[in-house]
């Protein structure tokens, strides 16, 4: 009986997640994904890059706040791009004879190719942002190692100097 109840509760929890998987991501979800990718790529420099509150515990929240506008732009741009692809009369010609719905697939009823397209485009934007953050971190570490005095003059000598550098050099904020 316990196993049946556990199984039913897991199915009940999984249903909203499965339904959500077909919808295009919201700007908040995109900002969270950007910050999760940045946290993974920056490692310990993540907290210094985004700063923290007095209890030194809110770098992720500050990251999400700082990426909110970029996330909104990523979702809007992805949506515009996908709408343009869907309306393109030559789409099948440039995609091996496949229609928009065939290229991006869809849900079980085949009606969510647009959502899949937007989701893929946003994932690409998140990956590009993570790559930019990692590249900025490498560049900043190299600059700090090459000339500590110049680095300190530009970004300060405090423990958040590396974070300031990464924020400044990251192409997408």
What are these regions (language model features)?
Residues 7-15:
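Bacterial N-terminal signal peptides
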Residues 20-173:
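Mature extracytoplasmic/periplasmic regions of secreted or cell-envelope proteins
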Residues 1-4:
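Positively charged n-region of N-terminal signal peptides that target proteins for export
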